[in-house]
Each structure stands twice: as structure tokens, then as C-alpha cells.
């Protein structure tokens, strides 16, 4: 595990602006028995420590273990919390009193961007790191744009500072 170059700086900037940083992640590995919650927590704690050393933080991590090929009790053909469904984003909005219409999602999969649209977010930023560089991902993310939902493209989250002014603009300056 390694942080994407520039990620901590973007998160620190968001933290400084009062913009909640919430990770919503599909974790089918838990559902399929490849690893457990304990291992996921260990990885998240390591990320938290690395970010803290760089002056940044994540406010919450919401994970979905459900998968169509998961083992009981995590086997589900289309769980509402699993992206591209909106469930995790709706839970985050409830827990943090977020205005979804002023919120954005950043992700490396078209399903992340699609989840943002399904939840009624203002937009999504598709990054080409991780899965984002796979054939068809960028095009599928672009296809989510429309009806007021904006899709931006970036090489990595390091370009995220370009997104931060949009958050303030959408939210009347409060960044939520």
C-alpha cells in the first residue's frame, strides 16, 4: 500500500476548508473470504497514520463487503450499498449532514462516478490511477455526465485542488 503522490496535500487542503473527506469503498474481498474486517482496519489505520504525518485526515471510511460472488452473509446480487449504487453515499450524507447536491466524489472506477450520479451529487472526478487506467473506465465515467451531473477527468487525485473551488462554489462557500 502506498499513497498516491499529492493525495495527502489535497486531503489536507480539503480538511482546511472544512470539506468532509469520506471514503466509500467496495470491499468484495471481505465478502468473498479473501481477508477480514481486521485486515481492512489495519490497512486503514496505516493510511490514517501516513496521512496524519503529512497533516491530513480522512473523516470516515464506509465499506461495503457485499458481492454477487460473496459468501454468506455477504452474498448479494446487487446490494444497495455496493457502488455503483448510492447506499454508502446516502449513509455518509445522513451521518455527516451532507448536502449531496453540493458534494462530489473522486474515484478511479466508473462505478464510483456512477454512484455519485445515483446519489444526486453535483459531480464526480474520475482519476486514472489504479483501476482508472483500465480500458473503458474513462469512457464509462464520461458517460455518467448529464442532467446537471458533471464529470471531470484527472490523471490523479493530485489534481484535486482544481476541484476544491467547485465545492465551495456549489455549496455557497461551506464546502459540504
Model-derived regions: residue spans:
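Short, charge-patterned binding micro-sites
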Residues: 25-32, 64-70
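Short beta-strand segments at enzyme active-site cores
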Residues: 20-26, 59-64, 126
